[in-house]
Structures are given as structure tokens and as C-alpha cells.
Amino acid sequence: MLRWITAGESHGPALVAMLEGMVAGVEVTSEDISTQLARRRLGYGRGARMKFEADKVTIVGGVRHGRTLGGPIAVEVGNTEWPKWETIMSADPVDADLLADQARNAPLTRPRPGHADYSGMLKYGFDDARPVLERASARETAARVAAATFARGFLRQVFGVEVLSHVISIGASDPYAGPEPTASDLAAIDASPVRAFDKAAEESMIAEIEAAKRDGDTLGGIVEVVIHGLPVGLGSFISGADRLDARLASALMGIQAIKGVEVGDGFETARRRGSQAHDEMRPGPDGILRSTNRAGGLEGGMTNGEALRVRAAMKPISTVPRALATVDMSTGEEAVAIHQRSDVCAVPAAGVVAEAMVALVVAQAALEKFGGDSVAETAANYERYASGVAARLAR
């Protein structure tokens, strides 16, 4: 089974991603990972950290000469700011006098509404929010994006598919309602400052960000992930835990600041009558044809051959420049929340992280379905299955 885990803190020496269960022969280089991490830093409305944050990638194990070996994969994403934080974030004990001289070490006792600070301090018995925010930070997603580069490579080599995303809306901007982008559109989407697939939508999003910036506020938004060309039958209806839509929803909800997920037309489908909610089928020369994809490529917890389409809603960033009302945990008195440098909007980057999680989950489901210890073996198993499906539909 494909499994992944990350370790590390936002201002620690490095983030680490571990990926277990990936087959041998997946073609991935350090440069490929760096490319995906650079995409994660994209986006209009990002903060100052993105200007000097550089992700130094080191593949520690599981890869030789650009190909996976079949064993556990470890990737380290170094923190270029580590020298500034070496004393404060040291894993080993530090002399109290040394810490006292560090302005950055001042206790953070005013939790931010909407962040993990308050609950984390109480749950783990911390008097300071620093240990909470360091791990809860969205910086952790860099490690997930690194791990997912292998899943993306696997899906590309076995199925010939690409995972892409685009921003549907930011704040109250006019939502995009046009056709689904394809893999050939990814470069154009990444070239957009807000990763939009439409110029009018892009302009509306930028206007929203500029207005929030002037007001000392932050914005959320909606992203969509699309994969064209997946085979029928990834996932299962056998149990709730095996349903691919449930697994995708869990993975996307596990991204920092994501508060909602929908598959296909999702919540809009609930407003329709059954006759207008489903994707009718008719025979075609090469199989079943559908004129709509309201289900988002998933029926009964399984892929149905149509484009996989899922959306995630990101809340506004909880580190608000004008600061929200809170309580100082050291005194119990009213206070304003702590404010560290932050983005006005990180929705474009959230799309790249959402791609990563979808890639990992779909690769996991594909390995469960087709098995194998190498890319060649998995691809051969898939080809046999695809031939059988095609023969059955041709009857």
C-alpha cells in the first residue's frame, strides 16, 4: 500500500517526506521536485517569504540515477532561513541566557482565531503557541508536494495522465464557469498570476486581492483539480473507507485552511431534480458516451472513465494584518492576536497542494487495483485490464 508521512517544522532545518510502497522505475529527479515546489510558491498576493524562500531538495534514499528503486523514498526540503532560527528551533537543549537574547523567542501567548494556536496549546499543554504554529504551518505542504512528485510520475508513466488544477474564485470574485482545462492548458494556467484559466476571472480575482490588501485583510477561495484519462474502476463501492471520493475528500480536507470539498457539481447537484442531476449514457463507437460530467468522474466511489473533477474551498488566512480580538493565555485578558508575516491570499498555491494530494490518493488506488513491483509490471497489468474492458464494451 502506498503510504506517506512528513516531518519537520516551518522554521526548522528541513522538512522531510517519506513515501513507502512506490514501485520501481518511476522517473523522478531532484529538478522535477524543485519544479513542483516552485509552482507551490506561485501566486498573486503571496507574502515576503516567497521572495527569499528557496526549497533546497535532497533525495536521501529510494532513488538511483533518476529512477525509484521500489524501497522507501525519503526527500529533504531544506530551509534556507535556518541560520536565523538555529538557536530558537534547536532540537537540543539551549542555554536560557542564549534564548533570552533572541527577540524571536518571545512567548506567543495570543492565539489567532482560526488557527491551530488555541486548541494546540491546550491539547499539548504548551504555554507558548510557537510549538503549535511551527508544525501547523502550511509550510509543511512543501514536503507533501515533494512526495507527490513521485505519484505524478507514476500516473504519467502508467496511464499517460497529468494532474492539473486551476483557481475557480478568490473571495467574492466572479467564479469561473467555463470548460474544464486539459493537460495542454497547464502552462497557461501557471503563467496566470492567480492560476486562472480565464482572463476575465483573473482580473476579478486580482481586484479582490488588491482590495483586501488595502484593507489589511486576507482572502480564501476555491480551487479545482482535474485529471483526464483515468481508467474505469479505481476505488471501490465495497466499504465507505474504500470509496475514492471519501479518500479524496479526506486528503483535501487535510490541507491547512481547507474547509470544504465537493466532487463534480457537488452541492449544486443537491439543488437539482434527479432527471437533471446525473450523467446519462449512450453507446458510442469506442464505448460508453456521456454528454455531461456532473458526477466529476466518480460514481459509487469508483472512477467511471470521465474526467476526475474535485474542488476544495480554502478559508481566508487566519494571520490577519489588522489583527483579530483574542485572549492573552498568560493573563486571561483581552488582547489582539499575534501577527507574523503572512500572505494576503494563498489560493493559487493551494491548487498545487491539492494536485499533490489528489495525485497521491489516485496513485494509491491505482496500485491497489493493478499491483506490481515495477512501472512496467503495473503498466502491463493495466493494459490487460483495459483490453478486457474494451472487449466487453465492444460486444
UniProtKB/Swiss-Prot annotation:
**What species does this protein belong to?**
Rhodococcus opacus (strain B4)
Keyword Transferase annotated:
no
Instruction: Quote the cellular component terms of the Gene Ontology held in the record.
Output: cytosol
Family the entry assigns: Belongs to the chorismate synthase family.
This protein's UniProt keywords = Amino-acid biosynthesis, Aromatic amino acid biosynthesis, FAD, Flavoprotein, FMN, Lyase, NADP
Cofactor remark from the record: Reduced FMN (FMNH(2)).
Q: Which PANTHER family match?
A: CHORISMATE SYNTHASE (PTHR21085:SF0)
Pathway(s) where this gene product acts:
Metabolic intermediate biosynthesis; chorismate biosynthesis; chorismate from D-erythrose 4-phosphate and phosphoenolpyruvate: step 7/7
The record's catalysed reaction(s) read: 5-O-(1-carboxyvinyl)-3-phosphoshikimate = chorismate + phosphate
Q: How does it assemble?
A: Homotetramer.
GO terms, molecular function: chorismate synthase activity; FMN binding
Q: What cofactor(s) does the depicted protein rely on?
A: FMNH2
- Report the superkingdom from the record: Bacteria
Ranges for region Disordered: 272-296
Q: Does the keyword Lyase apply?
A: yes
EC numbers: 4.2.3.5
Binding sites annotated in the UniProt record for NADP(+): R40, R46
State the protein's name.
Chorismate synthase
Q: What EC class is this?
A: lyase
